[in-house]
Amino acid sequence: MCRERDPQEDPASPEAGVLQVLDRQLAVGGQLVTFATAAAVYEDAFVPLHGEYQAHNALLALAAAEAVHGGRRLPARIVEDGFASVTSPGRLEVLRSSPTVLVDAGHNPHGIEALTGAIEEAFGFQHLVAVLGVMADKDAEGVLAGLEPVTDAVVCVPIDSPRAMDVDDLGEIAQEVYGADRVVVSQQLDEGVAQAVA
C-alpha cells in the first residue's frame, strides 16, 4: 500500500521530502519495509534480502525509480513486483540449508559490522563458523575482530587472486584474534567449507 505525499506538508517534518526507512519487520526470506520518499509512503513492501543496510539500499533504488518517472509515486504493484525479483549475489546470500551456508563479500570492518548485525537479526544460529579469505590490501585484523564475537571459529582459505593475502599469514592474524584453538587453515576453499560444515 502506498499514499501520495501532500504537497502542503511541512518539508522539515519527518514525513516530507526525505528518504526514510520508517519501519522494518523480519519476514520469511527477507523483510517487510515501510519506505518514505519525497513522493509517497510505501507500506510493508517485501524485500527478499536480509539486513538493515539492504532496506536502505532498496530505499535508494525506489527513489531512483521515482526520479526516472518524473518524481511521481509508483504504483504499488510495480514496487511489489520490482522488489520481488531483487537478488544481491554475494551479500548475505543463502547458498544452501541444513546446514545453512551463507556467502558474503564484506571486505572491511564496516561491511562486517553490517553483516554480523544482519546475521544476528535474521538467523538464530546456535553454531556459526566463518570461512574467510582476504585480499592483502584489506584490514584482515579488523574483519576478523568484527566476526569473532558472532562466530565459534574461523577457517582461513586461499583466494584465487594475485592480490590475495597468503592463507598462512591470514591464519596467524586469525590466531591473534580468535586464539589458536578456534582457527583452522585450509589450503583449498572446498576443503575449508567442508571443515566448517562438519
Describe each PLM feature range.
Residues 1, 8-10, 28-34, 100-102, ...:
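C-terminal helical cap/extension that packs against the catalytic core
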Residues 33-153:
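Nucleotide phosphate-binding/pyrophosphate-handling subdomain across enzymes
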Residues 1-26, 47-51, 78-85, 93, ...:
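Beta-strand->loop->alpha-helix junctions that form or flank phosphate-binding loops
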